[in-house]
Amino acid sequence: QLANEPPIEIIRQESTDNGDGNFNFLFETANGIYKEVSGYPTANGAQAMTGSFRFPLDDGQIVEVSFTADENGYLPVSDFIPTPHPIPAHVLETLAIVDELVRQGATWDEQGRRIT
């Protein structure tokens, strides 16, 4: 927030904590920021959460993210999260050839030249 701008109003805020590891939290601001999280204990005694958040970009687009955080880590899902390009078929074929050569005992020097 810039120094000369007024604070952004929180138009909705809710929070519940059952005291047993289950909780819900939600807030929404006047400028379109929103977050909602539900937490719960897992069978192994850890804490897990699911939720979502959204916020506007300067160009008017709305970024929306849903997520799970549990024993598998933080797993966000959003159209705005970059995904790697597919590996080209010729690269996959080359990697398969190298794997086979390694299985056959091939070795290479520091410059990548095959020794055996």
From Swiss-Prot:
The keyword Calcium does not apply. Glycans are attached at T83. Residues 1-22 are annotated as: Disordered. One of its GO terms (molecular function) is structural constituent of chitin-based larval cuticle. GO terms for cellular component: chitin-based extracellular matrix. InterPro entries: CHIT_BIND_RR_consensus, Cuticle_Struct_Prot, Insect_cuticle. The keyword Kinase does not apply. Pfam families: Chitin_bind_4. The modification Pyrrolidone carboxylic acid is found at Q1. It comes from the Eukaryota. Residues 20-85 form the Chitin-binding type R&R domain. PANTHER family: CUTICLE PROTEIN, CUTICULAR PROTEIN 47EF, ISOFORM C-RELATED. This is Cuticle protein AM1274. It comes from Cancer pagurus (Rock crab).
